[in-house]
């Protein structure tokens, strides 16, 4: 057995350590996911004016500040008793804020944080021996996704075309948010009861111009099939079967045109989505389309025991009507709340079933498995107890372990797409399950994020040009007495998944307790009080460190793929580094 530790896992937000035990066949037999820093924002908020939460919590993360601000605002809407009266145009503008932030986050993750692993030399070793086709595929992967300042065998590699093109689009999306929310990051327009800035006709016109530029990027790089055709036949398809059939037929046409010429370029119709949809999956690429090889990403990052995992979504994006029910996100959200079991059975979401365990975390809470409204944040203060190398039976992470009805929950794009029964992602998950694969894996996780980005582009156009009406009512007044001895719950969807804020106030109307459960905690959590691993840990166990080719303990590209496929944000999950140096990483790999 070989210990393979990635410490830190780079190209994520924050500091993460993944330790694995690997057998002679390259299969991971045990894993620990350790978040290396402690978050103190809940303690900062105590004794503050509740309204400050909408601004202070944005400082938890610079990538998704709007998600925290909106979630806090949702909690404050309930605290002040105004959720059912928030004007329609305020809710639509909140949708626009979040949609732009989520699209920017997804674009950053897909192209800058995750895709560079497709230029890993491990794939060159597998593809180039396949002759002209293999060489053509490898050249495309390198030419699209290589990061800046990249070298292979000491030779500088030009940055990939898709990688470079995505960077200014991230900037453009940030500028769109700043135009209507005041600034980005840390927008100032959020406020309980609505929002503060009445966007003008000129603002909407400028947003529309920006939008067209974003669509130019999508059509040039992300999707070469016409965007409306893609949406109509996937997101709007009448069934999962029809959505999958559309994609496989489209890919078959591309393959028939490209195999003789070995032209897999964007000019030949191979957008980044089409390219990964075909070559990323063993089932789709090799077994359905007859390709000579694939990256086999559907064979890693899955779950061995469906009874120990579920897919949780709190719901996001309000319907364009006045008011909403903060405790029933299934009824008034475009992305509905819900829970899907590991066997793809649909269940009703109940927020009262959420708890957090600290059995394997660096906390000295008085009670384990607490509901978030009663949550405690009491960290270890003795450096001797903060050890990351004690194994699965020890305490080894600053992350707590959120659970839904006692079960680990994957959150994020895949969970959202499954819960809204999005035809393409649901169809792929069902097809994989029917053929003996885990329905959740690196391949479906990444395609879900790509598909969600396309859906957001579609929905944003409606929110900006149809649903929002300049000059409409954007807020309602607050009764500050309503916030005394009160509670509020904010449930929302951040780019990385389900995000919840819980607030309690005292008789003076100040914050008595504040708890956040963030997507990174759901995804990267350690084991719970029952010894059940978190989602990342479960997805690692049973997977190979190299999805293709020979076992290479020095280049475990499979671990990189699996860890980054969740788009973890440890900056959200935990927040103060160990300054003693006692627990400094003993292995440093910059990859």
UniProtKB/Swiss-Prot annotation:
GO molecular function, one term: ferredoxin hydrogenase activity
EC number: 1.12.98.3
InterPro entries according to UniProt: Ni-dep_hyd_lsu, Ni-dep_hyd_lsu_Ni_BS, NiFe-Hase_large, NiFe/NiFeSe_hydrgnase_LSU
Main subcellular location: membrane
Keywords: Cell membrane, Iron, Magnesium, Membrane, Metal-binding, Methanogenesis, Nickel, Oxidoreductase
Topological relation to the membrane, as annotated: Peripheral membrane protein
Listed SUPFAM superfamilies: HydB/Nqo4-like (SSF56762)
Pfam families registered for this protein in UniProt: NiFeSe_Hases
Catalytic activity: methanophenazine + H2 = dihydromethanophenazine
Record GO cellular component, one term: plasma membrane
Residue numbers binding Fe cation: 64, 572
GO biological process: methanogenesis
Binding positions (Ni(2+)): 61, 64, 569, 572
Induction (UniProt): Expressed in methanol-grown cells.
Binding site for Mg(2+): 42, 575
Subunit structure: Composed of a large subunit (VhoA), a small subunit (VhoG) and a cytochrome subunit (VhoC).
Name of this chain's protein: F420 non-reducing hydrogenase I large subunit
Source organism (scientific name): Methanosarcina mazei (strain ATCC BAA-159 / DSM 3647 / Goe1 / Go1 / JCM 11833 / OCM 88) (Methanosarcina frisia)
Taxonomic lineage: Archaea, Methanobacteriati, Methanobacteriota, Stenosarchaea group, Methanomicrobia
Gene: vhoA
